[in-house]
């Protein structure tokens, strides 16, 4: 996926039962349990050094999760190019004319074919795939997840409920949880703060800067591909829980998740930024 995994030696774990037992023993010795694996990326990118590699990583992650006895695997739907000859991924967010609708129809055909295969692989491995509704993915809202799931008759594909990605879109998170119901397979507790910049930028802001020159502060999104620099006065920003929404909000969130599945793990997503360090 996007981020290397030095904490999880995939090659060794794939080939050695002893290595798998030793690896899981690290957590058991500390009375901990792995709630899931993560292989977020763009397995459908037309970039030759991204899409094929991320798809390969996902297939292996499904197999590895099954071998480790880990049920949940967080991933992303990915975004294909606009057509079969496209060089770059194309994220359509407002298909107000026929051209964008044609792009979406092509992308759906690519996404559906790929994820039908992943669903079968997940069923064979006894693994549940939890799609993160993340920006720059074809599946990024509760509604288009449900449309997607119906098209492919998804059995082992659901949602990773990370509310931070729905907050910046202006959604009612509780309503989203109620709509998705038992399609929610996994939960990330991560917050988003809405900032004054939203007044003039809106939520679909393209004022990002170039990749930082300093390699120590770059965030990798693929082989030799990195995140752009965040705007200096953004409309919104991802933050640790409590820095965007208060205790009452998070209490209601947890209650809504409990109503869907009382045994659901709540996986806190820790974020570090230079802004946080200055506070």
Question: What is each stretch, according to the model?
Answer:
Residues 1-22:
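Glycine-rich, proline-tolerant flexible connector loops at the mouths of alpha/beta enzymes
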Residues 186, 264-271:
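Conserved active-site loop/cleft motifs that coordinate metal ions or position small ligands
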Residues 28-29, 43-159, 251:
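Active-site acidic/histidine proton-transfer and metal-coordination neighborhood
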Residues 2, 70, 184, 262-263:
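A structural motif
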Residues 272-278:
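Conserved small/polar residues in nucleotide/adenosyl-binding loops
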Residues 245-259:
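A short, acidic, amphipathic alpha-helical segment used as a generic capping/interface helix at domain edges
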Residues 37, 101-108, 112-241:
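Acidic/histidine-rich catalytic cores of soluble enzymes
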């Amino acid at each position: 996926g996007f981020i290397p995994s030095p904490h999880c030696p995939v090659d060794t774990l794939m080939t050695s039962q002893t290595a798998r037992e030793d690896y899981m023993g690290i957590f058991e010795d500390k009375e901990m349990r792995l709630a899931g694996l993560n292989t977020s990326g763009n397995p459908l990118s037309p970039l030759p050094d991204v899409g094929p590699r991320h798809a390969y990583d996902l297939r292996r992650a499904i197999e590895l999760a099954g071998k480790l006895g880990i049920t949940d695997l967080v991933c992303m739907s990915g975004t294909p190019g606009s057509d079969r000859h496209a060089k770059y991924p194309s994220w359509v967010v407002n298909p107000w004319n026929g051209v964008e609708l044609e792009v979406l129809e092509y992308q759906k055909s690519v996404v559906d074919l790929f994820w039908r295969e992943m669903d079968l692989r997940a069923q064979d491995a006894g693994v549940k795939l939890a799609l993160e509704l993340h920006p720059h993915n074809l599946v990024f809202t509760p509604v288009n997840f449900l449309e997607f799931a119906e098209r492919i008759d998804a059995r082992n594909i659901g949602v990773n409920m990370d509310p931070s990605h729905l907050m910046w879109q202006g959604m009612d998170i509780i309503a989203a949880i109620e709509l998705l119901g038992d399609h929610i397979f996994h939960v990330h507790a991560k917050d988003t703060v809405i900032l004054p910049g939203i007044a003039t930028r809106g939520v679909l802001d393209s004022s990002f800067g170039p990749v930082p020159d300093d390699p120590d502060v770059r965030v990798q999104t693929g082989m030799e591909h990195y995140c752009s620099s965040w705007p200096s006065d953004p409309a919104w920003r991802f933050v640790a829980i409590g820095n965007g929404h208060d205790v009452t909000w998070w209490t209601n969130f947890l209650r809504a998740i409990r109503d869907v599945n009382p045994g659901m793990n709540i996986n806190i997503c820790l974020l570090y930024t230079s802004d946080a360090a200055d506070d």
